[in-house]
Amino acid sequence: SLLQFRKMIKKMTGKEPVVSYAFYGCYCGSGGRGKPKDATDRCCFVHQCCYEKVTGCDPKWDDYTYSWKDGDIVCGGDDPCKKEVCECDRAAAICFRDNLKTYKKIYMAYPDIFCSSKSEKC
């Protein structure tokens, strides 16, 4: 669920997820179009593509099972769909962490009007 994803992001990056990522670039948050602005925005693009492949559950609202081990996220549970959603969220949280050095405040609350180029395919 988005609430669990938020917790993963907070723990991985130390940033407040809603403020820092909900409206970042062209792909973070709902929707998405154009070319990702930087590595962080590409994390969101890949995350959206991952969600699009999930069938059988609702990635935004269905809770999944996960835990922390040695600073890493471990997805678990018996439901394959929910586990897949967890893996999507895990990969994005790690991607955000790995790209903290290139995070740009200029892309926070980025206006959609600047995301008008042709969208990439997943």
From Swiss-Prot:
Snake venom phospholipase A2 (PLA2) homolog that shows local myotoxicity, apparent anticoagulant activity, and neurotoxicity. Shows analgesic effect on mice due to a decrease of action potentials and nerve conduction velocity. These effects are caused by inhibition of voltage-gated ion channels (potassium (Kv) and sodium (Nav)). In addition, analgesic effects are antagonized by naloxone, implying the mechanism of action is correlated with opioid receptors (probably indirectly). Does not show detectable PLA2 activity on egg yolk phospholipids. Keywords: Disulfide bond, Hemostasis impairing toxin, Ion channel impairing toxin, Myotoxin, Neurotoxin, Potassium channel impairing toxin, Secreted, Toxin, Voltage-gated potassium channel impairing toxin, Voltage-gated sodium channel impairing toxin. GO terms for molecular function: calcium ion binding; calcium-dependent phospholipase A2 activity; phospholipid binding; potassium channel regulator activity; sodium channel regulator activity; toxin activity. It comes from Gloydius ussuriensis. GO terms for cellular component: extracellular region. SUPFAM superfamilies: Phospholipase A2, PLA2. Pfam families: Phospholip_A2_1. Monomer. It is found in: Secreted. This is Basic phospholipase A2 homolog Gln49-PLA2. Expressed by the venom gland. The lineage of its organism: Eukaryota, Metazoa, Chordata, Craniata, Vertebrata. The keyword Disulfide bond applies. PROSITE patterns: PA2_ASP, PA2_HIS. The keyword Membrane does not apply. Disulfide bonds join 26-115, 28-44, 43-95, 49-122, 50-88, 57-81, 75-86. It comes from the Eukaryota. Negative results: does not show hemorrhagic activities. Belongs to the phospholipase A2 family. Group II subfamily. Q49 sub-subfamily. One of its GO terms (biological process) is phospholipid metabolic process.
